[in-house]
Amino acid sequence: MFCPILFCDNLVKLFDDEVELSVLRQTSIHNFSELHIEQFDKFDKVKGSLINCMVEKVGLYKTQFKDICFPPTLKFEPIKIKRYLPGGYFDWHVDVTGHTSMSRYLAFFIYLTDNEEGKTRFLNTAVDCKKGSMVIFPPMWPWVHRGEPPIETPKYIVGSYLHYNSPAWGAPNYMWSEYGRN
């Protein structure tokens, strides 16, 4: 477990308290609601803890690969919380699809709820949706993945990406979190 259970429960509550301000992403390939936590002051207290969860885990990669090719500074894309209602989904895709997302090099999902059906499925494996657990993977081909639909209860996840450099798509600098040169 990478994030404490009570911390996950608190994030779900914070999302639900602001759900009317969430953005519904509903197309033929996905159906979920999301919030960018940087847009809400009430998330300021938890943002640091979320980043710490991610930095701690990515530190294992950074230690192993720093002399080979790991970027010296961690630049996180703005953190989003997503809610998939029963039947919600994100069909097969990759998270680097062109110029606007090409600087992403690692994807992070932290599962905020337990959900037997709401797995993250890759072509040859699947990751269970277990509260407090995290999955990290490259966001480009061939790590094609999908968010399987929860059946009985909503699925909540936190997501972000590490970037090689400044955002190609023009997000304001205040929305970016930068950590260390260690």
Task: Indicate where each model-derived feature is located.
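Non-heme Fe(II)/2-oxoglutarate
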Residues: 1-73, 179
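A generic fold-level signal
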Residues: 6, 73-76, 100-103, 129, ...
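Acidic, glycine-rich loop-and-strand cores that form catalytic or ligand-binding grooves
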Residues: 71-85
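Short beta-strand or tight-loop elements
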Residues: 77, 88-90, 104, 143
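Short, conserved beta-strand element in jelly-roll/cupin
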Residues: 81-85, 98-116, 161-164
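Histidine-centered catalytic micro-motifs
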Residues: 89-97
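Catalytic core of Fe(II)/2-oxoglutarate
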Residues: 104, 115-182
